[in-house]
Amino acid sequence: MFETTAKLRSAFLAYFETQGHQVVDSSSLVPHNDPTLLFTNAGMNQFKDVFLGMDKRSYSRAVSSQRCVRAGGKHNDLDNVGYTARHHTFFEMLGNFSFGDYFKEEAIRFAWTFLTETLKLPTERLCVTIYETDDEAFELWNKKIGVAAENIIRIGDNKGAPYASDNFWQMGDTGPCGPCSEIFYDHGDHIWGGRPGTPEEDGDRFIEIWNIVFMQYNRQADGAMLPLPKPSVDTGMGIERIAAIMQGVHSNYEIDIFKQLIAKTAEIIGVSDLENKSLRVIADHIRSCAFLIADGVMPSNEGRGYVLRRIIRRAVRHGNKLGATDTFFYKLVPTLISVMGDAAKGLVETQVIVEKALKAEEEQFARTLERGLGLLDNALNELSGKVLDGDTAFKLYDTYGFPVDLTADVCRERDITVDEAGFEAAMAEQRSRAQAAGNFGADYNKQLIIDEETQFCGYKGLSGEANVVALYLDGQAVNEVTQGQDAVVVLNNTPFYAESGGQVGDKGVLSAQGINFSVTDTQKFGQATGHQGKVLEGSIKVGTKLAAEVNKDLRQRTELNHSVTHLLHAALRQVIGTHVTQKGSLVNPERLRFDFAHFEGVKAAELKQVEELVNAQIRCNHELNTAEMAIDEAKEKGAMALFGEKYDEKVRVVTMGDFSIELCGGTHVGRTGDIGLFKITSEAGIAAGVRRIEAVTGAAAMAYVAEQQAMLDEAAGLLKSDSASVVAKLKAQLDKTKQLEKELSQLKDKLAAAASADMAGDAQDINGVKVLVKKLEGVDPGSLRGLQDELKQKLKSAIILLGTAKDGKVNLIAGVSNDLTAKVKAGELVAMVAQQVGGKGGGRPDMAQAGGTQVENLDAALASASTWIAERLA
């Protein structure tokens, strides 16, 4: 009955729907209005504001199958993916949720009933864990459900602090939290591992399949646990794990989804060994990559786009290992859509974009992969130790586009590690290499050439009737499109705004009797407007009359951000200077991004002044006036033009009081007061002479203010002050720290002077030259430079080599007086010693520093230095 993951997903959603739960679609992998997350990584993410009491829904019970990615930041499974049975970059989290509705008894009963009655799992294979003091949960499991006491395992604070437990869930240091109960499945005694709470619990025999979180407390800043007035429930069950159980396999990579993706990958590349771990890596990575692109993330060198690029390139590298000689990764998308079933809805709509973006990235990487792998191979062959230096790893990243974890992946196969600290240091030195974010796939459909002309009628209304004048399927003109097909529909007139001037295209619906076309984007093709989307019902022919309806909510939120962009532009010119000109923008329902020419970072005081000026204009509640006029007349009136836009002789001018006047064909609010509130969220440089401001408006701005206030309150709690005193309290703390650091530095200098006086007497005479080679115990690495300077002053003409080991790292410094550098160079000396401790270094002839990781080799390395020096002094 549940031989496929798709059927299992449907059964889960259907079961909870019969129990009064609202089926909620998976949210995007890009978290909405949550700066704490890189990617959506749990089913509860989209309900976070509901649990926090900041949002309300029309339902109090929900169920979902949430797409999740864990491949960056705190939740980073990338290194283990493909090498273990259950690590993935992408997974689906099945979950049911109660927002102040049912609580422990119902949540426990729902889970047990689904597992034992719907899925018919044998109860003798199941055991549960509870928080150590949660007697209520114990009674429910034992008395109500009938689980034997020996199969209910109490887990205490096993992470070193109160409430720090595998069975106590916390959203953060403060806020909703509570005990949780986990259900485990026993895969059988033929697999090593022990029950939860035993020393063998990390084995693969007992696997957690369902976590039920009981949010019943609100943790205060002082640690106090106050009962929530309306306790809630958040549960999660990884679909891959339960699918493995239902399909009678132990590894997630043996379930239907992965079997088909692995088989297809092997077929495309021409591989017969289906157990090869590289096939697992590729099968996993196509899921995260395809769905990330479908949710709007594109490969780039920063943020989410960089994580995506890392995953794509790791998959391509494993394809190369398998013998792939041509692009292959994008060819897995159709198979992925097939195996994901209903969960692939968004992927179906964006399939063309996803495939083209994957192919473009693969082709770009393929051009450098072979050369980069050759360089890495040479570096590893020449390596004498077991650590690849950070400079080489950075060169691979900087020159060949190798993410450092891909380099680490190759090294791992030879039992070699990468000096990640050295890599980060090299990265910091060359940070100026940053480039603007990539835009793979953004313009693929704009390659269409359409001779038709569409009249825009969306300034005053969001609906209207129109005739279909052209249809396009896969870039080709057709006379008809039918249900299930992705198409571009061209109308003779439309209320849909096509992407232009930074404003995103409208979304909505085209319909008629028996026809439903979902518009997911609107683009310009010459004089025509193309409505991109999918035929959900019926068929559309050229000549069909359709009702066009723009998504009102998305349009209105976009208009808030577009109108405030004009105010922002004018405010920047007033505060910073008239040299400020727009270099680009993005205006969508969620936020606005404004790029402008400016020679330096905008000062905090200037940003505050700009924000206050914009909000003052919002409060003025100016009416927005539009007028069409000749472009020369508009310029005479002082209207500003948008970067990169082409204008006709007749232009549309948008005016807001006497504050802003711009050429603009976009849609706007009726009055500036409609914007409500404007908040700047970030300001940064994106290229030489170009700055970027990101901001939010309306409800999104209110949410941002609330979030900032919450953080301020938390900071006040940590400083044991009120919000108004945070700055003064923090300044006092910093002043105190600065004074302590000054005193510590002075003390170190005194200690170094004293130590150098003692050590100077240990210098040996080698061929008439004073040579001091010494290992120092318990010396801070930061003190080496001062100590070396003191010794050079005392010894006058001398060669000095000092080494110390701390926290698993070796630090070396060499000093040579100027009269001896012709024979012995400090850089060569320290490099020779560093090589023996798994490190690298260098410097000037008279002073050089180095580091290493092989602490155990330090004594022998220092001992070899005297011989090396003697040979050069002979």
From Swiss-Prot:
Binding site for Zn(2+): 562, 566, 664, 668
Family annotation (CDD domains): AlaRS_core
PROSITE patterns in alphabetical order: AA_TRNA_LIGASE_II_ALA
EC number in record: 6.1.1.7
Catalyses which reaction(s): tRNA(Ala) + L-alanine + ATP = L-alanyl-tRNA(Ala) + AMP + diphosphate
Domain remark from Swiss-Prot or TrEMBL: Consists of three domains; the N-terminal catalytic domain, the editing domain and the C-terminal C-Ala domain. The editing domain removes incorrectly charged amino acids, while the C-Ala domain, along with tRNA(Ala), serves as a bridge to cooperatively bring together the editing and aminoacylation centers thus stimulating deacylation of misacylated tRNAs.
Protein name, UniProt field: Alanine--tRNA ligase
GO MF annotation, one: alanine-tRNA ligase activity
